[in-house]
Structures are given as C-alpha cells and as structure tokens.
C-alpha cells in the first residue's frame, strides 16, 4: 500500500477494508513518503520530483515481492494512471484507491459533488470522474465542495464537511469524498443530507481484491 501522507486512522481504515475483502491472510506492506504530498501542496501540482519518488515506491514494492499495489493518494492518482504500463510489464497491478468510487458516483447520478480539503486533490478527482464518465458513455455535472479543514481535529473536520455537504446538497445526486482520510465522516454526511455519500477505502479494497482474483490469487 503506497501512501504519500497518512494518519494512523487512515492506515487502520484501509487495512480494515482490505481484511473485509481478503481476510487476514494477506501480508500488508506500507510505503510512506509524506514529502510527496507536501511538495504537491507547495507547488499546486505534481512536480517531476514528486512523481519520480512515487514511481520509486511502486518499484520498491515490486522488488519487495508485492502481488498488487494500492495507491492511496488521490492527489497523485494520475501518476498511478501513467504507471499502468509498468504494472502490466511487471505483472504487478497498480490500483487507484479512488477509481471505482468515481465509477460508482457516475452510476448513481448525473450531478456529482466532490468534497475535498486540498485543491490538489479536488482537481485530480474531478478529472477522474470526468474520465470514467466518458468511458461509461455518460455525462456528469461536477460541483466543487472545497473545505478549509486540512489539519482540523476529527470533530471539527466532520462538522465542516457536513456543513459544506448541506450547502451543495440541492445541486447534487451523490457526493464523493476525494481523500481517503475523510472516510470516517461518510455516515455523518449521509445522515445530514440523505443522499449517497462515497468514500474511497472500501472501493479501493474491492478493486484490490478484484485485481488479485484476475491474477488467479
């Protein structure tokens, strides 16, 4: 599992979802480099250096004997897209944590709200929703939900997300949470607005399981 910035809560959430789908059998290796997201936030885009370090983590995972790689940071998800040929060549799939979540959002409605606390996550997530919508021969309207809550404690974070969701609720059919670290607010937001709310860890774990099944594992 490749993280560019993380918290113990996110690791616990992702591991829990993986075990729900795969049981306790898999050995989970965590690779972390917080400097990647810090550099992306500082520049406002994925720099060449940040992309190189991320791909370096993919290659380290391959060298360490990984059977599949889960990319957990949506801010650098497009690097994972660019690395798909590496996955095919090495036989080690590189799975984005958020892609199947984006597909489910397109299935659920034409108006998709995207909640994020970082502009560098908001735009790549919107790009992914637009791409998968084209692939599904669908069209979506995207509604921004940028919240200034990065670094807030859990209660404050949840309250700010709920307030933003309520603000855009009439404009959307479904809301997706652009960052995996937002997953713990999913139920609270759903209760507040009464519309589908999607977070990436469970979809990423399902995609991981599917990738392993396709390898015959």
Where are these regions (language model features)?
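Non-catalytic structural scaffold of enzyme domains
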Residues: 1-217
